[in-house]
């Protein structure tokens, strides 16, 4: 007669089998693998769907397991001293290795606690597919967050992408599913098969994957990022103490896929090839930093990288993670800083990625008024969810700490700050106090910047923020968001609007030139002419310029030199320096052939020389964020469309004069004092740049009857910037 204990055991046993066979088991390790058995023995249980026969290696001998269920459950009774490393099983790929279900968890209680609180700042070591040595055995540990899933399985090359074979176990109440697979190696392709509460089985790429297949394929790949031998230790150490505010910062904004192609065709250059070519180019051209449009994995070329599917994976378009590490290392060895565009505000709706990851609104808000962006047709992160903010903050730290990137430019911050951004009146939900500010996003940004500055001192956090939100670059302690720098979108828009006007009528728009100085020191600004200004029918910078061809090139020289002279750090998007006529096209390389023509060679030489000039002039960068660095000489000459001011740094003073019309002034008087000597040291109208060559070889100093200096008499070249050294 069967005892109650035996009946209970049989019931639990059958329940285990049912859940394994139907792939709905939360704890497959509780049944599969190595377990204590009756009379001091142990039992190994194996699951091979529909298999008729299974062999395993036990203490060096091949033995056959007994099938105990027709769907493919097997067991083998073994001695009590058997351990996880005393037997091996055959995987579907035919390889013999240790049993995944005989190992302890790799995602521990501390991991669960920190993740639940949103403060697991080294989460990138624990989540996703990672090469690991666990209990002395090499393999790959997998962990994925899917709290609302009925079950999660690992599907990969080694198990022939069969979602029944390798169910994962959930770790407590964390929502994290885990599995360690011994013997797996670098290059293994994998995904997660998630059984949703709605009964669907969906296939998802790993949100924490370090590498991915080349689009359009979407599988994640196991990568080794520990093997690379970094040689930039001195750079990383110096970065911690670098006072970047008082140093030159001249950023070259680059889209890797279209900066240059192989042999003038559509094939991409590798990260290693790009490292050598871009480094040599930036050193020659006088750029101190490279800012890359997003290189995190993304499915669509035309998104330019701003719709990210793999936040931890350098895109495979240009090589492997190790190639990207080489890229960063090489830049640092040649004293060039690297900034990445980073997109924590939204993500694409592609079914293989983060969207409705476990069948529910997991990374995004459920309500489309909060969780869907109508302009970009993307999902918006739920910043108030600890696990989501942790995913993003750990991602920022991953790029800055592990991949040695020097800074992040946070994309579309305005869309994060405001709940009504891009929405009509009834398309958004007010915050808890009835306002339009996204309080959760604001708190996320403060948390992000605080942790980055704490853990990665010297790293730059830059905001692309297009509104007048107060305190973007103010410290968190003083109520700000804590960014280091902010793109000066207002100055950029005013400047480009002014330059688009007919030159003889610019006097009616003089305010566009001077208004930016009203707020120039309210934040720490970067003056930018970015990729956004040369696409979607906006024309290239050169094509925006009015006038005949000579005037267009002169205007472009004036535009760039005007930016160089203004307070703030600098950024220029690729292509402007060669005078590209066409808009930027992400599918083709820059039109380098233009440099064979004198006009384009002239603008190229101009950018090269003014960049190097900038680097040598502390007055143009040493006190960028202080009123002390700038003094108006004349901002009111609307009639002639001329402005003049002095830039200061240390003991140096530079007089900058800009003539925004094509008119030549042979006798232009400026009222200026407190100097005894003046020398023209840069002129954008130089013949070598394609200009008319109107120089001030010996500017006349005007004195009063007491022989005190009261002004200057200058020659003003047409459409030109003139820079003088005062002493």
Swiss-Prot record:
Pathways per UniProt: Glycan biosynthesis; glycogen biosynthesis
Keyword flag Glycosyltransferase: yes
Keyword annotations: Carbohydrate metabolism, Glycogen biosynthesis, Glycogen metabolism, Glycosyltransferase, Transferase
Record-linked SMART domains: Aamy
Highest rank taxon of the organism: Bacteria
Recorded GO CC terms: cytosol
Disulfide bonds: none
Catalytic site: 411 (nucleophile), 464 (proton donor)
Chemical reaction(s) catalysed: Transfers a segment of a (1->4)-alpha-D-glucan chain to a primary hydroxy group in a similar glucan chain
Gene Ontology annotations of biological process type: glycogen biosynthetic process
EC number(s) given by UniProt: 2.4.1.18
Keyword Transferase: yes
InterPro entries: A-amylase/branching_C (IPR006048), Branching_enzy (IPR037439), GlgB (IPR006407), GlgB_N (IPR054169), GlgB_N_E_set_prok (IPR044143), Glyco_hydro_13_cat_dom (IPR006047), Glyco_hydro_13_N (IPR004193), Glyco_hydro_b (IPR013780)
Enzyme class: transferase
Molecular function as annotated in GO: 1,4-alpha-glucan branching enzyme activity; cation binding; hydrolase activity, hydrolyzing O-glycosyl compounds
A Pfam match: Alpha-amylase
Similarity comment: family membership: Belongs to the glycosyl hydrolase 13 family. GlgB subfamily.
Subunit description: Monomer.
Function: Catalyzes the formation of the alpha-1,6-glucosidic linkages in glycogen by scission of a 1,4-alpha-linked oligosaccharide from growing alpha-1,4-glucan chains and the subsequent attachment of the oligosaccharide to the alpha-1,6 position.
Full protein name: 1,4-alpha-glucan branching enzyme GlgB
Gene: glgB
